[in-house]
C-alpha cells in the first residue's frame, strides 16, 4: 500500500455504457471461480435479499416479478421494460457497482487499500448507496456483507419511489417508458427556477405534481417532475422550449423532491429494512454528500442510511459541491503525497468534468492523477475456471457410444450417415411384427397401425451374454434396451478410459447411472409370450440402470426416467444436476428405445403423432408427423476439473442444463413457445452466456406442424432476436437429426446430443435433409434477416482462435416437458512434450472370450495399419492404464509400432491360437519377493526408476535420510550414478543395496502387487525382514551399516575370497578329496544356491588353488567381486558385537511369511527370529536351495507361483528357475538395461499370469505427457437373443370387447397367404432382408394333413414320429428361399446341411382337431456363406414359442464341383465294398433281404408307410450293408426334397443298427440324434433307381453311440452323402417314455427327449450351482410317464410346497396297502440292491461306487439317469425322478437319501 497516494472512489448514478446483461453474465461467470469467493458471496446474499423483499410484496406486485435464481434473471430487457423494471433499476445498479468493486480487488488479488483519511468515497444519487456499503467496511469481506444491505435499501427506495410516482402520473398504457427528468444546459439555476415557478403558477399545479430542479451545477440544470408536466413546462416557456435540453434515463420516478417526501417516508424505507448486520456497524471511510460536497456526519450505519435517504428523497444534487469536495480531499497533505487516484466505473460527462476540475486545481503540482477503471477487469480471461463449488463447475462429456438406425452401430458409422445425408427410413422389419397383418392404411382394422414406416437398428437381439455374466435364458428375457444400455455404457466408459477406482472421481461409490426410457415393448409383448423367472428383472425399467450399476459394481444412484420423447436428454440433465449437487463424480446417462409393439404404433397413429408418408420432414411444408425410430445412446459425464485431472479426452463441455414444463399450452401435447423460451433463458443465465454467441442449435425438430412452428419461434426470438441483431459473422446454424434417423422417442434427445458432440469433433455441421419440398410457411419469414437458418449442405464450423463455440441441444416431450442443454468447446489441450525416457512399452489387450480377444487384436492391428503415426507411448497408456481388463489376455513389451504389429500378426497367424489362449485364473497366483545380496551391486542401479518415479525417488531419499541420521554416508550418488567409478566401501555398497531393495519392494506394492512371502539371500535377508515387518526399516539400515563398519574394522580386505562353483556341495567335496594336493585344503560352504550351484569361501590363496583344481576338471568357477568371504570364519570377529547390537532391536512376528535360507523353512512367527538368528545368518551357510525345497514341501509354492527378484540384478531369479524350472520369474532391475523397461516387462508377465497391476501408478508421474487414444471399441462375442412376436394377438384382443372369442394366432396365420408355403413350411411370420444377411421365421402345424401324413409315414411305438428327413426338407426349403432372396439370379443352390442335432423327438398328437405348431428360425449370412437353423415348439393356444430349440442345424452354401471331385476319389472304394457285399451274399456269408423282410426287421423300432419303403433289396453283413432303392414316383405334396425320398436313400443305416445280428435289438433300440452333413449333388428324381451303402462302427468317445457315412449312388457315381450319421443305443424299456404322444400342446412340455440328447458335465455345474433338498420318492405299482424335456432331468427338483407356500419338504406320502410291502424301513439290503443295479447298468464294478464318487465322474448322464430311474421302478418298486442323480450328486448322498425316504 502506497502511503503517499490520495484516493477517491466515485460511484455513479448511471450504468456503464457496456451491455448491461453482458456485464452481469461476466460477473456471474467469475463468481463461480474460487478466485472470486467474495464476489460470489455478495451476489448470493444480494439475490437472497431481493427474494426476501419480493416475498413481502402484495400479490399484484409479486406477480410482476418473474422467478429468479440469481440477479442475472432480473436483467432481461423484457423485465426491465416492464411495470416493475424501472423500480428495480436502483438495486440493479447498486449490485453492479459493488460487484464490480469487489471483483476488481479479487481479480488483482490485492489487499484492502482504502485507508481512512487517505481515501474518500463519493457518488451521485443512487450511487451513494453503493458507496455507503464501502464506507461501512474495513475489509473486502465486509463489503460482501454490507453490500447486500445496501441493495436492500436501494431496492426498497426504488420500489417506494416508483409507487409514489405512479400515484402522481400513471405509466403509459403501451408500456413505453417516459423520463421523469430533463437536463438543461447553458442556463443558470435561477433562470430555470423562474421559468418553472411561472409555469407552476400559471397552470395552478398542485404542490405534489409541480416541476422542480433536482440537480444543478455551473453548466447544467436537471429538471424533474411528472413526464407530462415536464413536457408541458417546456412547451409553456419559450425560454425552456428553445433551450438545449435532453431527457435523462430516469424512469423510476421522482427523487430529490422535498415537496413530495417527508421524514416518515424516509423512516419507512430505512428503518424497516430489518437489517441484522448493520445496526452496530460504524462508518470507516468518509463519504461525500452529493448536496454539500462534505462528508456525511453520521457515525453509525443507521445514521448514515438515514442521512443518505434524506438526501436522495429531499435534497438537491450540486455537482459543483461534489467536485469541490473531491478536489479538497486530493489537496496534498504533505510533501510525501506523490499521486492522486480516482477509481470509477467507466467514464461519463460528469466524471470527465470532475477529472477536469481536479486537474485544473492541481495543475501546478508535480504530481500524477491516476484514473483507474473498476469495470475493465470483468472482460479479462483468468484462465481455466477453478470452481468455487460443485454447483459452479462446468461439466465435461468424456465418452459416448450408440446403436442407431441405418447400421450406425458406432460413432464413425453414425457420422458417415450424417455426412452423406442419408435417410434411414424403412418399413417395419418382420422380426418386429408382421405388416401383412398389422398394417391397415384405412384405419378400419382395430389395433392396426396406419403407417408402415420406421427407423430401426440392425441386429437388436445380438448380445454378448457371457461378457455380462448372464445366462442365455436371462439374456433372452432381458429387454434389448437393457442389454444395449449395458453394451453402450461399457463402450462409452471404454472411450472415456474409465477404470473404476483409478481416480477419486471414478471410485465406484461415486458413479451413478441415469437413463431415459418411455416404453416397455419387450416386456409387454415379446417376453410376455412366455413369462419366466427373469420377466421382472429383465423387463422392469428400473433394472436397466440397476443392471449397469450391478455389473460394474457402481454404488452411486441409479435412475430410470420417463419424460416421453425428451427422456434421453432429461436423463442427461438429471445426471448433470447430480454432478452439480455433488451426489456423484461420474455419471453415465442416455436414452433407450427399441420398438417391437404394434400397439404403440396404433396408439401414436390414432393420436395423429405419426406421419403416414414416411420420414420426419423437419421444417417442410408437408410435415405431417414424426416417424418412429429405435435408438440407444450413452454418454459419460464428469465435472470439468475432474476430467482434466484424470487426463480425459473432453468431447464438449456442458455449461447449463434445464428442464421445465409447458404448463400454459393449449393442450397437454401441444408445445408452448413461452415455456421453451423460459427454459432457454434459464440455461443461458445459469451459464452466464449471451444467446447471440450461440452458433449452432440441434433442434428437437420432429416434423410436426405445431412442433416446428413453435420451436422456430422460440429459437429465433431468444437466439436471433430482432434486436440486438446478429452480426454477419454470427450466423446461427440449425440442424435436426430426426430428418436422418427419425424420432427415437426416449432416445431422441441422446441422438441429438451425440450428433452435436460429433459436430464439435468434426468441425462440420451436416446437411439438413428434412425439407423435401419447400420450407414450412409457419416458420418465421425473417430468419435470414436475423442471420439464422438450417445448414442445407455440409457446413464447416471452425473453432475461432482463442474462443469457444457454443451450441444448444433441444429435446421436448409430448407430455409438455422441455429439456435444453448448452454446450461449449472443450478446453484446448496442450500436450506436455516431455523427453521420452521410456524405451519399452507394455501393450495389453483383454477380453472375456477367445473370439473377442482375437477380434480385439485384429481390430488393433487394423487400426495401426490405418494410423501408422500412432504414438507407442499413448497406445501403452491407453491399453493398460485406461482399460478395464478381463480374463482372456494378450500382452507384450515392445519398443516400436512395427514390433507390436509383428507380435500381433504372429499370434493371429498361429493356427493354434484359440486352443493355446487360456483365461487367467480367478484367483491370481501368489507372488514371492526374492531379495538379492550385495554381489549384484553396481553404480547407477535403479537410476531410471529414481529419475522417473517420484514415489520411488521419495522412498530412496527417505531411507537415505534415515541412513545419514544414523551416521552413514548418502547412497543417492550411487543410485544417481554421480559417484566416481571406483570400488565403493562395504558400508556404501551394502547400504545402497538394502535401501534400493526396500524401496523396490514398496514400489512393487505401489504397483498393486500383493506379496505372499519374502526370501532374502545373504545381505538381502535384512531387506526381507524389514519388508515383512520383523524389524523396522530404520533398524534394518542401522544393522546393515553397523555390520559393514564392523567388517571394515575387524576383517582384512583381500585376505579371503569367495568362489562360485557350478557343482553341488557333495560333488565339490568328492572332487577335491580325490586329489592329494587339494584333499587337505580348507574351505567353507558359504551358499548352497541350487543343487548345482555352490559358493565356497576361505583364504584367498587356498580358494585360488581350489578354483584351478576344479577348472581342470571342467567345472565352471567364478571368483566373486567381494572384498570379504561372508558366511565363513572371516566373519567371526564381528559376531559378538553384531549380536549385541541386534539384541537392542525389537523383533516382531512377520506380517508376510519369511522363507529362511538359514533354517530351510518358512517362518510365520517371531520365535525363530532374534539377534541370534542374525548372528547365525552372518556366519553360517545360506542354504537357498533347501529353503526353496521347503516352500514346495510346505505347499507355499507351486509351479504357478510368481517370483520377483528384488535387487540391482536378477541373481535370485536364476536360482529359483534352476530349482523350479517352470517357475515364472521376473526382475526389478537389470545391469545394462533400462530399469523402466525391466519393470514394464515384469508387469506384463504378472498381468498375463492373472494379476492386475496398478497401471495408473506406473503412468502417473508423466500422465500429462500421454494422450488417451480413441481406439476401436471392444469386439463382442454376440448371439441373437431375439424373441419374435408370434401371431396377431395384439389385434385379436380387440375382439374381446365385442364378446367374441378370437381365433388362435396360429390358425389365423395359417389362413393368410404366404410368400413361402409348402407341405411342411406353412407361413412366414417374420422376414428381414438386408444387403448380406437375411432372417426368416416360419411356423408350421404338425396336425396339418400334409405334415401329419409325413409324420405318420414313420411310426414308433404306434406313434407318428417326425423323421430327420422332415427337418432336412424344411432346411433345404428355407435355405434356397432365403439364398435366392439375397442372390436372386442364382441358377442352382447347392446346400450342405451340417451339424444336424435333434434334441427332442417330435411325436404327433393323437388329439383330433388339435393344433401342434412348430417354429423354424433361420439366419443367413452371405459373408460366411452359411445359414443357421433352429426348430422350436410353440403353444397351440397362444402361439407362444418355447424358450429352447428342439433341433438345430447349419447350411453351408458350397461349390458342388468340390463335392464331385471329392466323391470321384471315393467312388471306386465304395463300389468295391458293394461288390464284396454282393459276393459275400452269393457265398451265403451275408444276408440278402427282400423288401418285405427288410421292412419287417425295421418294425423292431419303426414302421414305415409304403411311400417310405424305397429299398427293393438289402445285403446286410453285420454293421455293413448296401441296398437297391427305387423312389416312388409320387411327391405326395409340395416339397423341396420329399421326406419319403430322403428316407428311402438314407435309412439303410437305421436298418443296420436295428436289424443286424451285431446289435442287441432285444434289449435296445437305436435312434439317430443327427449327422455331421447331408449333401445331394442333384435333386432326387421321382421313380429313379439308386444304391445306398453304409458301414457303421462304434464311436470310441461314447460306447453307446455308432456312426457311419451313407453313400447314395446313381449308376457308378456318388450323388449324395449323409456324413457321420449317428445312432444312439437306448434301452428298450424307455420306448414308452420317449415315444408317447403329447397330451398337451403347451411349450412347457412338448415332447419327451430324444435318446441322442446329451448334457456335458460342465453344463450341469452351470445350471445347478446349488441343489435343493431332494424330493422323496413315491412308491407305486404302475409307471408314471414323464413328458418333461431331457434338460429338465438336469434341473433341481422343486421343493414340495405346502398350501401356505411353505417350501419345507413334506414327509413321504401315505402309500396304499399294495404298496406297503415296500414302504417299511429299508435295511442295507436295499442299498446293496441299488448299488448292484447301478453297477450292472453302468458297466462298473460295485467297488467303484464309493460314497464320494460323483455321478458325473461315473458317467451317469441324463440318459443313464432315465434308465436307472426306470430300473429302480421296475425292479425295486421305487419311483424316483431321474433328477435324483443331480440332486444327490454323489453315491453317498444318494444312499443317505434312500435310507431317509425308502
From Swiss-Prot:
Transmembrane segments: none annotated. Residues 1486-1632 are annotated as: C-terminal hotdog fold. GO terms for biological process: fatty acid biosynthetic process; secondary metabolite biosynthetic process. GO terms for molecular function: 3-oxoacyl-[acyl-carrier-protein] synthase activity; fatty acid synthase activity; phosphopantetheine binding. Its EC number is 2.3.1.-. SUPFAM superfamilies: ACP-like, FabD/lysophospholipase-like, Thiolase-like. This is Non-reducing polyketide synthase nscA. Multidomain protein; including a starter unit:ACP transacylase (SAT) that selects the starter unit; a ketosynthase (KS) that catalyzes repeated decarboxylative condensation to elongate the polyketide backbone; a malonyl-CoA:ACP transacylase (MAT) that selects and transfers the extender unit malonyl-CoA; a product template (PT) domain that controls the immediate cyclization regioselectivity of the reactive polyketide backbone; and an acyl-carrier protein (ACP) that serves as the tether of the growing and completed polyketide via its phosphopantetheinyl arm. The active site is at residues 565, 700, 743, 1354, 1543. Residues 1390-1628 are annotated as: Product template (PT) domain. Residues 392-825 form the Ketosynthase family 3 (KS3) domain. Its cofactor is pantetheine 4'-phosphate. Residues 1322-1632 form the PKS/mFAS DH domain. InterPro entries: Ac_transferase_dom_sf, ACP-like_sf, Acyl_transferase_dom, Acyl_Trfase/lysoPLipase, Ketoacyl_synth_AS, Ketoacyl_synth_C, Ketoacyl_synth_N, PKS_Beta-ketoAc_synthase_dom. Keywords: Acyltransferase, Multifunctional enzyme, Phosphopantetheine, Phosphoprotein, Transferase. Residues 931-1224 are annotated as: Malonyl-CoA:ACP transacylase (MAT) domain. It holds the Pfam family CurL-like_PKS_C. CDD domains: PKS. Pathway: Secondary metabolite biosynthesis. It comes from Trichophyton rubrum (strain ATCC MYA-4607 / CBS 118892). Residues 1322-1458 are annotated as: N-terminal hotdog fold. Residues 25-256 are annotated as: N-terminal acylcarrier protein transacylase domain (SAT). The keyword Phosphoprotein applies. The keyword Acyltransferase applies.
Amino acid at each position: 500500500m502506497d502511503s503517499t497516494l490520495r484516493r477517491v472512489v466515485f460511484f455513479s448514478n448511471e450504468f456503464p455504457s457496456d451491455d448491461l446483461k453482458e456485464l452481469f453474465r461476466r460477473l456471474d461467470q467469475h463468481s463461480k471461480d474460487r478466485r472470486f469467493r467474495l464476489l460470489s458471496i455478495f451476489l448470493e446474499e444480494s439475490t437472497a435479499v431481493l427474494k426476501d423483499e419480493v416475498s413481502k410484496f402484495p400479490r399484484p406486485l409479486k406477480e410482476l416479478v418473474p422467478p429468479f435464481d440469481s440477479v442475472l434473471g432480473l436483467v432481461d430487457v423484457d423485465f426491465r421494460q416492464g411495470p416493475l423494471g424501472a423500480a428495480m433499476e436502483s438495486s440493479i445498479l447498486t449490485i453492479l457497482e459493488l460487484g464490480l468493486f469487489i471483483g476488481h480487488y479479487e481479480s488483482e488479488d490485492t489487499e484492502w487499500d482504502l485507508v481512512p483519511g487517505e481515501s474518500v468515497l463519493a457518488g451521485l444519487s443512487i450511487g451513494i448507496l453503493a458507496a455507503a456499503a464501502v464506507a461501512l467496511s474495513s475489509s473486502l469481506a465486509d463489503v460482501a456483507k454490507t453490500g447486500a444491505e445496501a441493495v436492500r435499501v436501494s431496492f426498497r427506495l426504488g420500489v417506494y419511489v416508483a409507487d409514489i410516482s405512479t400515484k402522481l402520473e400513471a405509466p403509459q398504457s403501451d408500456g413505453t417508458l417516459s423520463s421523469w427528468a430533463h437536463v438543461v444546459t447553458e442556463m443558470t439555476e435561477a433562470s430555470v427556477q423562474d421559468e418553472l415557478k411561472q409555469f407552476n403558477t400559471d397552470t395552478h399545479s398542485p404542490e405534489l405534481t409541480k416541476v422542480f430542479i433536482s440537480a444543478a451545477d455551473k453548466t447544467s440544470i436537471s429538471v424533474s417532475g411528472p413526464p407530462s408536466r415536464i413536457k408541458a413546462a417546456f412547451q409553456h416557456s419559450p425560454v425552456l422550449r428553445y433551450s438545449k435540453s435532453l431527457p435523462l434515463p430516469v424512469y423510476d420516478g421522482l427523487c430529490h423532491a422535498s415537496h413530495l417526501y417527508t421524514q416518515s417516508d424516509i423512516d419507512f424505507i430505512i428503518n424497516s429494512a430489518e437489517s441484522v448486520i448493520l445496526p452496530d456497524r460504524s462508518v470507516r471511510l468518509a463519504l461525500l454528500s452529493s448536496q454539500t460536497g462534505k462528508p456525511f456526519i453520521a457515525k453509525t450505519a443507521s445514521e448514515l442510511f438515514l442521512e443518505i435517504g434524506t438526501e436522495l428523497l429531499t435534497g438537491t444534487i450540486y455537482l459543483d459541491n461534489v467536485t469541490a469536495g473531491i478536489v479538497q480531499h486530493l489537496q496534498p497533505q504533505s510533501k510525501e503525497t506523490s499521486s492522486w487516484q480516482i477509481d470509477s466505473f467507466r467514464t461519463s460527462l460528469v466524471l470527465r468534468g470532475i477529472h477536469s476540475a481536479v486537474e485544473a486545481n492541481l495543475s501546478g503540482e508535480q504530481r500524477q492523477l491516476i484514473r483507474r477503471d473498476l469495470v475493465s477487469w470483468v472482460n479479462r480471461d483468468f484462465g481455466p475456471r477453478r470452481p468455487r463449488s460443485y454447483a459452479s463447475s462446468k461439466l465435461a462429456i468424456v465418452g459416448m457410444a450408440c446403436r442407431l438406425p441405418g447400421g450406425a452401430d458406432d460413432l464413425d458409422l453414425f457420422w458417415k450417415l450424417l455426412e452423406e445425408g442419408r435417410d434411414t427410413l424403412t418399413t417395419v422389419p418382420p422380426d418386429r411384427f408382421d405388416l401383412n397383418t398389422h398394417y391397415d392404411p384405412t384405419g378400419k382394422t382395430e389395433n392396426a397401425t396406419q403407417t408402415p414406416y420406421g427407423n430401426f437398428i440392425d441386429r437388436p437381439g445380438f448380445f454378448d451374454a457371457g461378457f455380462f455374466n448372464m445366462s442365455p435364458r436371462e439374456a433372452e428375457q432381458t429387454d434389448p434396451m437393457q442389454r444395449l444400455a449395458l453394451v453402450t455404457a461399457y463402450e462409452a466408459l471404454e472411450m472415456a478410459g474409465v477404470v473404476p477406482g483409478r481416480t477419486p472421481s471414478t471410485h465406484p461409490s461415486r458413479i451413478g447411472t441415469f437413463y431415459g426410457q418411455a416404453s416397455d415393448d419387450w416386456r409387454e409383448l415379446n417376453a410376455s409370450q412366455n413369462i419366466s423367472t427373469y420377466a421382472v428383472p429383465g423387463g422392469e425399467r428400473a433394472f436397466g440402470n440397476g443392471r449397469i450399476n450391478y455389473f460394474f459394481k457402481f454404488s452411486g444412484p441409479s435412475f430410470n426416467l420417463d419424460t416421453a420423447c425428451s427422456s434421453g436428454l432429461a436423463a442427461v440433465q438429471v445426471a448433470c444436476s447430480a454432478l452439480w449437487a455433488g451426489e456423484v463424480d461420474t455419471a453415465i446417462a442416455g436414452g433407450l428405445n427399441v420398438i417391437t409393439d404394434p400397439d404403440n404404433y396404433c396408439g401414436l397413429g390414432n393420436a395423429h403423432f405419426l406421419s403416414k408418408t414416411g420420414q420426419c420432414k423437419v421444417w417442410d411444408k408437408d410435415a405431417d408427423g414424426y416417424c418412429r425410430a429405435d435408438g440407444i445412446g450413452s454418454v459419460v459425464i464428469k465435472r470439468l476439473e475432474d476430467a482434466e485431472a484424470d487426463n480425459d479426452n473432453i468431447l464438449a463441455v456442458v455449461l447449463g442444463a434445464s428442464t421445465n414444463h409447458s404448463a400454459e399450452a393449449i393442450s397437454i401435447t401441444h408445445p408452448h413457445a413461452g415455456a421453451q423460451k423460459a427454459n432457454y433463458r434459464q440455461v443461458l443465465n445459469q451459464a452466464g452466456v449471451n444467446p447471440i454467441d450461440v452458433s449452432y442449435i440441434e433442434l428437437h425438430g420432429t416434423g410436426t406442424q405445431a412442433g416446428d412452428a413453435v420451436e422456430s419461434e422460440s429459437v429465433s426470438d431468444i437466439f436471433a432476436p430482432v434486436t440486438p441483431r446478429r452480426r454477419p459473422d454470427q450466423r446461427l446454424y440449425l440442424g435436426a437429426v430426426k430428418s436422418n434417423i427419425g424420432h427415437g422417442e426416449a432416445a431422441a434427445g441422446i441422438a441429438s446430443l451425440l450428433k452435436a458432440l460429433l459436430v464439435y469433433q468434426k468441425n462440420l455441421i451436416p446437411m439438413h435433409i428434412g425439407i423435401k419440398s419447400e420450407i414450412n410457411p409457419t416458420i418465421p419469414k425473417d430468419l435470414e434477416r436475423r442471420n439464422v437458418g438450417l445448414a442445407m449442405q455440409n457446413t464447416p464450423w471452425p473453432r475461432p482462435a482463442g474462443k469457444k463455440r457454443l451450441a444448444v441441444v433441444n429435446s421436448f416431450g409430448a407430455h409438455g416437458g422441455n429439456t435444453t442443454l448448452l454446450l461449449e468447446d472443450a478446453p484446448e489441450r496442450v500436450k506436455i512434450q516431455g523427453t521420452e525416457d521410456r524405451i519399452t512399452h507394455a501393450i495389453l489387450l483383454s477380453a472375456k472370450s477367445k473370439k473377442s480377444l482375437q477380434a480385439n487384436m485384429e481390430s488393433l492391428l487394423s487400426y495401426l495399419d490405418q494410423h501408422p503415426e500412432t504414438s507407442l507411448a499413448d497406445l501403452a497408456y491407453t491399453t493398460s492404464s485406461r482399460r478395464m481388463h478381463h480374463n482372456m489376455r494378450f500382452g507384450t513389451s515392445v519398443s516400436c509400432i512395427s514390433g507390436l504389429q509383428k507380435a500381433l500378426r504372429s499370434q493371429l497367424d498361429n493356427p493354434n491360437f484359440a486352443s493355446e489362449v487360456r483365461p487367467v485364473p480367478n484367483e491370481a497366483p501368489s507372488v514371492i519377493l526374492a531379495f538379492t545380496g550385495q554381489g549384484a551391486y553396481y553404480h547407477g542401479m535403479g537410476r531410471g526408476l529414481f529419475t522417473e518415479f517420484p514415489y520411488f525417488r521419495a522412498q530412496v531419499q527417505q531411507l537415505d535420510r534415515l541412513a545419514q541420521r544414523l551416521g552413514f554416508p548418502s547412497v543417492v550418488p550411487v543410485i544417481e550414478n554421480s559417484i566416481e567409478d571406483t570400488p565403493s566401501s562395504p558400508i556404501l555398497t551394502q547400504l545402497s543395496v538394502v535401501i534400493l531393495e526396500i524401496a523396490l519392494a514398496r514400489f512393487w506394492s505401489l504397483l498393486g502387487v500383493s506379496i505372499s512371502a519374502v526370501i532374502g539371500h545373504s545381505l538381502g535377508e535384512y531387506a526381507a525382514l524389514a519388508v515383512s515387518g520383523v524389524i523396522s526399516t530404520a533398524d534394518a539400515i542401522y544393522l546393515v551399516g553397523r555390520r559393514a563398519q564392523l567388517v571394515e574394522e575387524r576383517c582384512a580386505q583381500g585376505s579371503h575370497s569367495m568362489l562360485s562353483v557350478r557343482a553341488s556341495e557333495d560333488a565339490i567335496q568328492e572332487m577335491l578329496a580325490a586329489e592329494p594336493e587339494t584333499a587337505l585344503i580348507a574351505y567353507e560352504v558359504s551358499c548352497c544356491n541350487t543343487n548345482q550351484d555352490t559358493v565356497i569361501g576361505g583364504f584367498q590363496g587356498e580358494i585360488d588353488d581350489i578354483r584351478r583344481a576344479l577348472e581342470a576338471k571342467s567345472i565352471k568357477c567364478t571368483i566373486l567381486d567381494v572384498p570379504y568371504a561372508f558366511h565363513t570364519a572371516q566373519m567371526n570377529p564381528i559376531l559378538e558385537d553384531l549380536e549385541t547390537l541386534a539384541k537392542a532391536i525389537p523383533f516382531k512376528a512377520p506380517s508376510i511369511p519369511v522363507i529362511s535360507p538359514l533354517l530351510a523353512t518358512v517362518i510365520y512367527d517371531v520365535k525363530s527370529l532374534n539377534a541370534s538368528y542374525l548372528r547365525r545368518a552372518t556366519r553360517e551357510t545360506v542354504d537357498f536351495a533347501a529353503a526353496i525345497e521347503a516352500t514346495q514341501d510346505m505347499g507355499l509354492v507351486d509351479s504357478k507361483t510368481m517370483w520377483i527378484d528384488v535387487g540391482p540384478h536378477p541373481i535370485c531369479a536364476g536360482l529359483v528357475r534352476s530349482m523350479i524350472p517352470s517357475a515364472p520369474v521376473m526382475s526389478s532391475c537389470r545391469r545394462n538395461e533400462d530399469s523402466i523397461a525391466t519393470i514394464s516387462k515384469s508387469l506384463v508377465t504378472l498381468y498375463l499370469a492373472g494379476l492386475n497391476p496398478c497401471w495408473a501408478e506406473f503412468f502417473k508421474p508423466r500422465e500429462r505427457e500421454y494422450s488417451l487414444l480413441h481406439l476401436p471399441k471392444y469386439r463382442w462375442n454376440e448371439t441373437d437373443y431375439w424373441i419374435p412376436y408370434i401371431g396377431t394377438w395384439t389385434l385379436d384382443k380387440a375382439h374381446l370387447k365385442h364378446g367374441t372369442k378370437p381365433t388362435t394366432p396360429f390358425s389365423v396365420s395359417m389362413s393368410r397367404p404366404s410368400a413361402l408355403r409348402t407341405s411342411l413350411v406353412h407361413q412366414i411370420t417374420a422376414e428381414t432382408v438386408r444387403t448380406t444377411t437375411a432372417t426368416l421365421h416360419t411356423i408350421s402345424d404338425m396336425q396339418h394333413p400334409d405334415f401329419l401324413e409325413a409324420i405318420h409315414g414313420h411310426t414308433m411305438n404306434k406313434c407318428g414320429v417326425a423323421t430327420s428327413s422332415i427337418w432336412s426338407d424344411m432346411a433345404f426349403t428355407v435355405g434356397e428361399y432365403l439364398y435366392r432372396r439375397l442372390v436372386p439370379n442364382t441358377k442352382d443352390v447347392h446346400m450342405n446341411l451340417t451339424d444336424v442335432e435333434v434334441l427332442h423327438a417330435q411325436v404327433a398328437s393323437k388329439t383330433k382337431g388339435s393344433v401342434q405348431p412348430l417354429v423354424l428360425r433361420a439366419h443367413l449370412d452371405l459373408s460366411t456363406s452359411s445359414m443357421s437353423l433352429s426348430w422350436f415348439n410353440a403353444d397351440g393356444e397362444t402361439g407362444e414359442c418355447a424358450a429352447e430349440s428342439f433341433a438345430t442345424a447349419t447350411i453351408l452354401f458350397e461349390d458342388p464341383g468340390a463335392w464331385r471331385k471329392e466323391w470321384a476319389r471315393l467312388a471306386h472304394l465304395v463300389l468295391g465294398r458293394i461288390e464284396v457285399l454282393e459276393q459275400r451274399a452269393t457265398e451265403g456269408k451275408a444276408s440278402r433281404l427282400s423288401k418285405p423282410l427288410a421292412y419287417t426287421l425295421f418294425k423292431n423300432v419303426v414302421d414305415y408307410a409304403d411311400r417310405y419303403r424305397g429299398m427293393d433289396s438289402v445285403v446286410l453283413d453285420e454293421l455293413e450293408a448296401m441296398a437297391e432303392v427305387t423312389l416312388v414316383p409320387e411327391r405326395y405334396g409340395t416339397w423341396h426334397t420329399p421326406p419319403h425320398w430322403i428316407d428311402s436313400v438314407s435309412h439303410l443305416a437305421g436298418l443296420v443298427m436295428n436289424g443286424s445280428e451285431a446289435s442287441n435289438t432285444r434289449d435296445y433300440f437305436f435312434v439317430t440324434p443327427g449327422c455331421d452333413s447331408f449333401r445331394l449333388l442333384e435333386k432326387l428324381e421321382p421313380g429313379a433307381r439308386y444304391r445306398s451303402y453304409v458301414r457303421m462302427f462304434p464311436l470310441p468317445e461314447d460306447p453307446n453311440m455308432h456312426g457311419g457315412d451313407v453313400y447314395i449312388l446313381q449308376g457308378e457315381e456318388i450323388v449324395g452323402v449323409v456324413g457321420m450319421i449317428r445312432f444312439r443305443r437306448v434301452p428298450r424299456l424307455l420306448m414308452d417314455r420317449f415315444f408317447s404322444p403329447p397330451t398337451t400342446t403347451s411349450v412347457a412340455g412338448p415332447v419327451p427327449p430324444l435318446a441322442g440328447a446329451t448334457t456335458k458335465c460342465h453344463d450341469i455345474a452351470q445350471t445347478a450351482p446349488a441343489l435343493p433338498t431332494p424330493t422323496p420318492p413315491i412308491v407305486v405299482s404302475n409307471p408314471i410317464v414323464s413328458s418333461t424335456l431331457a434338460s429338465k432331468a438336469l434341473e433341481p427338483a422343486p421343493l414340495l410346497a405346502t398350501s401356505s407356500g411353505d417350501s419345507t419338504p413334506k414327509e413321504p406320502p401315505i402309500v396304499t396297502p399294495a404298496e406297503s410291502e415296500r414302504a417299511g424301513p429299508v435295511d442295507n439290503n436295499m442299498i446293496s440292491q441299488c448299488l448292484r443295479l447301478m453297477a450292472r447298468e453302468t458297466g462298473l464294478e460295485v467297488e467303484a461306487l464309493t460314497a464320494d464318487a460323483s455321478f458325473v465322474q461315473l458317467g451317469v448322464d441324463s440318459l443313464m439317469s432315465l434308465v436307472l430311474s426306470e430300473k429302480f421302478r421296475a425292479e425295486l418298486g421305487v419311483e424316483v425322478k431321474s433328477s435324483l442323480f443331480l440332486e444327490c450328486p454323489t453315491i453317498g448322498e444318494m444312499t443317505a437319501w434312500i435310507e431317509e425316504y425308502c
